[in-house]
């Protein structure tokens, strides 16, 4: 555990200046979605309010967990930081865990502020419970793991392209800010095996008590966490 906390502290000291920027980016993105989308949609009913509130939170998580974390990690990899850490006499799995926890700490303040902004904007019902907090942690972990897996697996140029593509898919096409019933069935089937739609479904069900809690959605997130962590550990344990 001592090694883990030293790694965590080291990661924090390397990137502490980014923490405030992460929170600011999430808050500004949430404000733009919460106040901008209604200008396009027009009158907001109860269902739309829950979709916009939960969607703005998830888009903020995606923006930091996938879109920003991937280039940051890819840049650290190209600068030799990953090779240096791998050479340290610490278990490789602790390297991954320390990175994940550091980014979790960085992303959570913006998440909670985004939830509060949605509450004040639309007066939606919030479910303050252990399950709600756990689901928020799980969603953050899923998106951060996905961002890390992309950064560790691909070259920096591909990482930049994929991170932007993920945000565009999440913001423009995924049924995150609107009901999935508006899309063709075959697209819905595809989106339900990706982590984004299951995440927002669980977010609405557990944090906002809007809709049922789906074990299938929960399973999809667990599978994505396991797959992405296997990819990360494969790179960390790979001998050059």
Per-region residue spans from a language model:
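Short hydrophobic, aromatic-rich alpha-helical segments embedded in or entering the lipid bilayer
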Residues: 1-9, 176-217
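Short alpha-helical transmembrane interface motifs in multi-pass membrane proteins
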Residues: 18-22, 54-55, 62-67, 97-102, ...
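Hydrophobic alpha-helical transmembrane segments of multi-pass membrane transport proteins
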Residues: 29, 49-118, 165, 171
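Hydrophobic alpha-helical transmembrane segments of multi-pass membrane transport/permease proteins
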Residues: 17-43, 50-66, 166-171, 219-228
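Transmembrane helix-loop junction
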Residues: 42, 75, 115, 119, ...
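Junction motif at the cytosolic side of a transmembrane helix
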Residues: 11-12, 36-40, 120, 207, ...
């Amino acid at each position: 555990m001592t090694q883990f906390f030293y790694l965590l502290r080291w990661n924090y000291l390397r990137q502490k200046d980014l923490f405030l920027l992460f929170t600011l980016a999430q808050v500004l993105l949430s404000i733009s979605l919460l106040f901008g989308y209604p200008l396009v949609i027009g009158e907001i009913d109860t269902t739309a309010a829950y979709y916009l509130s939960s969607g703005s939170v998830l888009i903020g998580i995606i923006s930091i967990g996938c879109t920003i974390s991937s280039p940051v990690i890819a840049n650290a990899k190209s600068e030799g930081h990953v090779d240096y850490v791998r050479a340290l006499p610490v278990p490789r799995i602790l390297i991954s865990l320390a990175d994940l926890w550091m980014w979790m700490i960085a992303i959570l303040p913006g998440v909670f502020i985004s939830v509060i902004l949605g509450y004040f904007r639309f007066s939606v019902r919030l479910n303050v419970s252990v399950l709600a907090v756990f689901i928020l942690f799980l969603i953050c972990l899923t998106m951060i793991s996905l961002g890390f897996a992309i950064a560790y697996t691909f070259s920096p140029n591909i990482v930049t392209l994929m991170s932007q593509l993920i945000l565009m898919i999440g913001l423009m096409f995924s049924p995150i800010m609107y009901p999935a019933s508006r899309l063709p069935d075959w697209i819905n089937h595809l989106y339900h095996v990706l982590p984004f739609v299951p995440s927002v479904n669980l977010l609405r069900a557990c944090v906002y008590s809007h809709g049922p809690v789906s074990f299938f959605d929960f399973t999809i997130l667990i599978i994505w966490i396991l797959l992405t962590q296997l990819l990360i550990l494969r790179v960390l344990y790979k001998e050059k």
